[in-house]
C-alpha cells in the first residue's frame, strides 16, 4: 500500500507570503490555454475570422469568471442546497472550498455565449476553439487535488492503493490520478487530434462533452461519493448523473453535424 506524501499546501513560502499548489495549478492551466490557443487560432476557420492573441486573452478572462462563478453556484445548487439556503453568506466564502466542475462548465458556456455575441460569431465556433484546450487544464486541476490530498477514492485492495492520512488509514483508489489521466491527458490528446482534422461546426464541442462525460462517469466508480450526498438513484453518484446529459448532448452534436471541410 502506498501512503500519500501529505505535501505542504504551499508550493513556495517567502516569509509570511505563500503561493499554494492549487493556485499554481490554476496558473499553469491558464498558461497552457494561451500557449495551445495560439496554435488553435492558426486554423483556417479562425484565420478567416481574423482571430488574434488579444481575442484569446479576452476569452480567457471571460472563461475564468465563468469557472469561478458557475463552479461555486453549481456546488451550492447541486451538492449542498439546503446548507446554503440556511447560510446564504457562505456562498461567497470560496476560500473554504466547494467548486463543481459541472457548474463551472455551465458558467463557461454562458461566458462563451456572451463572447460569441460580442464578436458577432456563433457559439459553437467559439466553443470548438476552446474545447481542445480544456482537458489539459483539468489535468492540472486534478494534480492540485492530489497534492492537497482531497477528493480521494473508494477503498480498494489493488497494489497501487493509497492511504490518505487526512481522512483515514484505509487503502483507497488514487482517483485524482485516474481523472488526471482520463479526463485530462487521454481526452486532451484524443480531442486535439480530432480537432486537427476537418470538422463541421459543433462536432469538436460534441466530442468534448461525450469524452468528458464518459471519462468522468467511469472515474466516479473509483471516487468516494460526497459524504453529505452518498449515492443517488440506481447507485450512481451526483457526478455521474450530471454526466448523463453531457453524454447524450455530445452524441447529438456529433451525429447532427456531419463531417464537413473547414
UniProtKB/Swiss-Prot annotation:
Report the sequence similarity comment from the record.
Belongs to the Lgt family.
Bilayer-spanning residue ranges: 17-37, 59-79, 94-114, 121-141, 176-196, 201-221, 231-251
| UniProt protein name | Phosphatidylglycerol--prolipoprotein diacylglyceryl transferase
Q: Which residues bind a 1,2-diacyl-sn-glycero-3-phospho-(1'-sn-glycerol)?
A: 142
- Biological process according to GO: lipoprotein biosynthetic process
Q: Which domain of life is it from?
A: Bacteria
Keywords of the record, alphabetical order, are: Cell inner membrane, Cell membrane, Membrane, Transferase, Transmembrane, Transmembrane helix
Q: Identify the metabolic or biological route this protein is part of.
A: Protein modification; lipoprotein biosynthesis (diacylglyceryl transfer)
Q: How does it sit in the membrane?
A: Multi-pass membrane protein
What compartments host this protein? Cell inner membrane
What would be one Gene Ontology cellular-component term for the protein? plasma membrane
Per its UniProt entry, what is the enzyme's top EC class, as one word? transferase
Q: Which GO terms describe its molecular function?
A: phosphatidylglycerol-prolipoprotein diacylglyceryl transferase activity
Q: Which NCBIfam families match?
A: lgt
Which PROSITE patterns would you find in this protein's record?
Answer: LGT
Where does this protein come from, organism-wise? Polynucleobacter necessarius subsp. necessarius (strain STIR1)
What role does it play? Catalyzes the transfer of the diacylglyceryl group from phosphatidylglycerol to the sulfhydryl group of the N-terminal cysteine of a prolipoprotein, the first step in the formation of mature lipoproteins.
